[in-house]
């Protein structure tokens, strides 16, 4: 965004470089970026459908339907799993661009850019952990509920 790109800071420089890393991925037809882009419509649909199927299955006592809802939650986990290396690669490319073009002059600037990009990457690690946790949580609700009824 212009607000980020026009700020005179190492953080802004690192964020812009990360986005340029995505542009490089796109220009080089980076396979995981293409895969992630292809998954977006499916993930949008299953993220909407999953909770509906899960709740309907629980309320109607049709547990196979609820399991289909849980399977829909798996779409978010797969998307997060694919997204993580895409984002790490964009950060790696961005940092390399900054170094190659002499935009990071001091050790502190290099460390600062690396810290910003690492912190950004950790948000994707957290998203993956959250998606897996959600999948396991709803799966355990169904799995535990089935054991009690048997």
Predicted regions and their residues:
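Polar-ligand-bearing catalytic/cofactor-coordination segments
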Residues: 1-44, 78-150
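Hydrophobic transmembrane alpha-helical segments that form the core helix bundle
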Residues: 42-93
């Amino acid at each position: 965004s212009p607000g980020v790109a026009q700020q005179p800071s190492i953080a802004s420089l690192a964020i812009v470089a990360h986005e340029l890393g995505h542009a490089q991925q796109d220009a080089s037809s980076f396979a995981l970026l293409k895969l992630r882009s292809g998954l977006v419509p499916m993930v949008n649909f299953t993220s909407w459908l999953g909770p509906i199927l899960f709740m309907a299955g629980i309320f109607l006592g049709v547990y196979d339907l609820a399991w289909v809802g849980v399977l829909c939650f798996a779409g978010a986990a797969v998307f997060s799993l694919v997204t993580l290396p895409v984002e790490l690669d964009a950060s790696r490319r961005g940092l390399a661009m900054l170094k190659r073009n002499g935009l990071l002059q001091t050790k502190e600037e290099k460390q600062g850019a690396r810290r910003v990009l690492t912190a950004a990457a950790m948000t994707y690690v957290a998203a993956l952990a959250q998606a897996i946790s959600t999948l396991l949580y709803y799966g355990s609700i169904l799995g535990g509920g089935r054991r009690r009824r048997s």
